[in-house]
Amino acid sequence: MALPTLPFYWCSQQRLNQQLARQREQEARLRQQWEQNSRYFRMSDICSSKQAEWSSKTSYQRSMHAYQREKMKEEKRRSLEARREKLRQLMREEQDLLARELEELRLSMNLQERRIREQHRKLKSAREEQRKLIAEQLLYEHWKKNNPKLREMELDLHQKHVINSWETQKEEKKQQEATAEEENKRYENEYERAQREALERMKAEEERRQLEDKLQAEALLQQMEELKLKEVEATKLKKEQENLLKQRWELERLEEERKQMEAFRQKAELGRFLRHQYNAQLNRRTQQIQEELEADRRILQALLEKEDESQRLHLARREQVIADAAWMKQAIEEQLQLERAREAELQMLLREEAKEMWEKREAEWARERSARDRLMSEVLTGRQQQIQEKIEQNRRAQEESLKHREQLIRNLEEARESARREKEENEELKSARKQELEAQVAERQLQAWEADQQEKEEEEEARRVEQLSDALLQQEAETMAEQGYRPKPYGHPKIAWN
């Protein structure tokens, strides 16, 4: 019996599905484990943070503050109860005191009633006496008013009083005119004195302002001169910085030339060594050494010339560098003379001797080159350090100069602004003083005009009153002359006096 067979792709699909299911289960387990771990770490972080917070000084202080607040509340409550108890005690004492006073008042009511009755009787009798006095005074006034002789005497006195009053009014008017004239003179004198004082103050203020303007102008000129000097100094510092940068570039160029010469020398040595031309090599090597020495001598000569042209700063270090450069120059010149002597000797050597001499001289040259390179490196390094220090000093000086110039410019701007504000204030002050003087003049003129008008009105009123009085007197005299004498009616029969 034949077994059924399954296609290959079906088996592969089933294995792939199983593998995907296992992978998903594994990812789910990993995700669940990751969530558990993250939850654990999150809870541990929360616990540790809370524990740290509870055990921190801030939590301790907060707890102590809460304890102190509760303690203060308890103390306040006890204090409030004590005050309430004290108030209750005071209220009881006050009630007892009021009860005693009420009892005493009730006992003294009868005595007070008797006193009031006695006082009422005294007041009544006093009123009766006062009424009697008033009645007597009224009777006396009535008799005095209705007595003909007294009336004639009063009329004569009134006429005399009127005549005397006219004289008195004339004298008072003259005195008022004199007083007004003196007051006007006093006002004029005060006005002139105030005007002179104001002019003197304005003159003194103008002189003070001119002096301040002069001093301020001198200060501004001095600041402008200082600003110009700072600008010249800044230009000089910029030029010096450019010169120092050129010197540094020159040193770098010289050092690069030495490196190139060294590389060229090494290549030439290799070629000469391969060709085994010892005599020619010795000659060329000698010439090369001479050229190197000559180049080093030129470099040192240039350094010495640069040092002579630079400013006299860092004197001790510069003298040491100059001395080292001079000594190096002298040593190079001596070695140059020695190499020339060696070159003359080489012309007389044989090949084997030249070979031995080559090896010997090569060792000597290597030692000398090493020492010379070391010395040149020290000299160049010192020179570069010196140039770098000068550049830094120049930069700091430029920064200080720039700050100083900016401060001077700000001072100039502030001075100009202050001068402008002061000028405006002076103009406003002058205008205010002028307006004040004009107002005073106008007020004086108005007062004088009002005084004149019042005097004219008073004179006109007096003239009108006098005319009216004369007209009334004349009319009354004419009426009395026409009517004749008429006795005045009285309420009781008048007794004819003999």
Swiss-Prot record:
InterPro entries recorded: CFAP53/TCHP, TPH_dom
Coiled coil feature spans: 11-39, 66-353, 380-479
Keyword Cell division: no
GO cellular component: centrosome; cytoplasm; keratin filament; mitochondrion; plasma membrane
Basic and acidic residues biased stretches: 389-405, 415-437
Region ranges (Trichohyalin/plectin homology domain): 259-425
Taxonomic superkingdom: Eukaryota
Sequence segments annotated as region (Interaction with keratin proteins): 73-498
Location in the cell: Cytoplasm, Cytoskeleton; Cytoplasm; Cell membrane; Mitochondrion
Biological process, per Gene Ontology: apoptotic process; cell projection organization; negative regulation of cell growth; negative regulation of cilium assembly
Keywords attached to this entry: Apoptosis, Cell membrane, Cilium biogenesis/degradation, Coiled coil, Cytoplasm, Cytoskeleton, Membrane, Mitochondrion, Tumor suppressor, Ubl conjugation
Region (Disordered): 168-191, 386-405, 415-498
Post-translational modification: Ubiquitinated. Ubiquitination by the BCR(KCTD17) E3 ubiquitin ligase complex results in proteasomal degradation, and induces ciliogenesis.
Chain's role: Tumor suppressor which has the ability to inhibit cell growth and be pro-apoptotic during cell stress. May act as a 'capping' or 'branching' protein for keratin filaments in the cell periphery. May regulate K8/K18 filament and desmosome organization mainly at the apical or peripheral regions of simple epithelial cells. Is a negative regulator of ciliogenesis.
Subunit structure: Interacts specifically with keratin proteins including, KRT5, KRT6A, KRT8, KRT14, KRT16 and KRT18. Interacts with KCTD17.
Family, per entry: Belongs to the TCHP family.
Protein name per the record: Trichoplein keratin filament-binding protein
